[in-house]
């Protein structure tokens, strides 16, 4: 598994994917600051936007581009014809994507702490960090989801599905259906944790996100093995 991760890191070393890990949270923060800079709830609004839209689309772009480049270059022939266990390879690709998303989330929270000080917001830094971590855990299922979807369709279709998922999350956010819509889990959790409301129901969102991520990872790996 370590060798697979090393190979994946080398593949993205000189690609735009490595740059996007740093660039996407910067773009997100700059754009949201430009829109909400005069709002007293600036930090909360930005955290909310990140939880249901920016993180989703950023994961789709990062994982999607990594899969897209390899699909376009070789159609995975060098992997499919190698003695490497395909199940382990796909799990390694997913873990690589998760590491990238974790780095991106760290960059985002650092930028958000800077925004908090610049605009003298009152949100507690500890709660901000907890909220970003919670949203990340509840959204990790998106990594195997996009890895599988881009591989069987294409990058644009996958991003389109992700965009529609986020839009639908907005309409469902104030209904009982939001608990059943995975694209809504990050936003629901952020709305609670940013206020320090760590109720049991919020932890169930994290658990569901992790379980769904494991299920989709296994599904994506077996799908790749049978390709």
Residue positions per predicted region:
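Aromatic- and glycine-rich beta-strand/loop motifs that create alpha-glucan
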Residues: 1-22
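Selective transmembrane-helix segments that form parts of the transport pathway or gating/packing helices
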Residues: 16-17, 86-115
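Hydrophobic core of alpha-helical transmembrane segments in multi-pass integral membrane proteins
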Residues: 23-33, 105-113, 206-220
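Terminal transmembrane helical anchor/hairpin motif
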Residues: 38-41, 159, 163-227
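Long, hydrophobic alpha-helical segments
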Residues: 47-69
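Helix-loop-helix units of permease transmembrane domains in multi-pass membrane transporters
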Residues: 66-98
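Membrane-interfacial helix-loop-helix connectors in multipass membrane proteins
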Residues: 111-132
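Hydrophobic alpha-helical transmembrane segments of polytopic membrane proteins
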Residues: 126-153, 210-219
């Amino acid at each position: 598994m370590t060798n697979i991760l090393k190979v994946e890191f080398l593949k993205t070393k000189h690609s735009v994917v490595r740059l996007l890990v740093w660039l996407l949270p910067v773009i997100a923060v700059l754009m949201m600051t430009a829109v909400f800079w005069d709002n007293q709830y600036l930090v909360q609004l930005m955290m909310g936007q990140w939880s249901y839209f920016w993180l989703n689309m950023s994961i789709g772009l990062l994982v999607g581009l990594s899969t897209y480049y390899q699909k376009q270059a070789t159609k995975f022939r060098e992997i499919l014809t190698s003695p490497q266990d395909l199940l382990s390879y796909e799990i390694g690709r997913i873990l690589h994507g998760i590491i990238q998303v974790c780095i991106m989330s760290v960059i985002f929270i650092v930028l958000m702490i800077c925004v908090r000080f610049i605009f003298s917001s009152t949100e507690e830094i500890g709660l901000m960090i907890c909220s970003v971590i919670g949203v990340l855990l509840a959204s990790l299922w998106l990594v195997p989801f996009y890895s599988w979807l881009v591989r069987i369709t294409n990058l644009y279709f996958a991003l389109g599905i992700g965009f529609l998922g986020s839009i639908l999350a907005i309409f469902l956010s104030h209904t009982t259906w939001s608990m059943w819509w995975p694209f809504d889990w990050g936003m629901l959790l952020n709305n609670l944790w940013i206020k320090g409301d760590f109720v049991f129901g919020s932890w169930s969102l994290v658990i569901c996100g992790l379980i769904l991520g494991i299920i989709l990872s296994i599904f994506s790996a077996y799908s790749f093995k049978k390709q």
